[in-house]
Amino acid sequence: MARIGDNPIPFGDEVTVSVDDHNVVTIEGPKGTLTEQIDPEMTLDIADDHVVVRRPTNQKRHRSLHGLSRSLIVNMVEGVTEGYKKELKIIGVGYRAQMSDETLEIALGYSHPIYFLPPSDVAVSVDSDRGQDDIIIVEGIDKELVGQVAAKIRSLRPPEPYKGKGVRYVDEHVPLKAGKTAAR
């Protein structure tokens, strides 16, 4: 097994980590501040340059929460220092995206345009300069929220399996099916 929870979580000088009495972890960095409630049964030891998560017993529940707690804190540290970014590509004739103020306006082959207002913690932009397909860029410091917003945009028109038209992640491979063949 990986035993990922036993590894210490390093953080740099620009990051400050604090924990209150209810196991609410607050991490501040150059890009912002994130707060997360960690399971109260886990204990957190904060040193000068790292955090260690400890579990009370070796029960299955505690082992799983141990790794989860560590992963959540690692994602928070990475978010406040580097941030997260997801890119989506819009493929299809007449499929377009553009920003109007804070709202993302997308034409995806429906009879009406779709207006998507992202949460305030996430920045959404459109890059139309990379060839013929528009690219939607979702950025933020909260990994879960960035992934959730990107998945919601993708779900507006998922790639269809015959021509691959729709919204997909830039690095996503969509396997295409063969069409019908004529009878002989």
UniProtKB/Swiss-Prot annotation:
The keyword Transferase does not apply. It comes from the Bacteria. InterPro entries: Ribosomal_uL6-like (IPR000702), Ribosomal_uL6-like_a/b-dom_sf (IPR036789), Ribosomal_uL6_a/b-dom (IPR020040), Ribosomal_uL6_bac-type (IPR019906), Ribosomal_uL6_CS (IPR002358). GO terms for biological process: cytoplasmic translation. GO terms for molecular function: rRNA binding; structural constituent of ribosome. Keywords: Ribonucleoprotein, Ribosomal protein, RNA-binding, rRNA-binding. One of its GO terms (cellular component) is cytosolic large ribosomal subunit. The keyword Cytoplasm does not apply. Pfam families: Ribosomal_L6. NCBIfam families: L6_bact (TIGR03654). This protein binds to the 23S rRNA, and is important in its secondary structure. It is located near the subunit interface in the base of the L7/L12 stalk, and near the tRNA binding site of the peptidyltransferase center. HAMAP family: Ribosomal_uL6_B. Part of the 50S ribosomal subunit. Belongs to the universal ribosomal protein uL6 family. This is Large ribosomal subunit protein uL6. The lineage of its organism: Bacteria, Pseudomonadati, Rhodothermota, Rhodothermia, Rhodothermales.
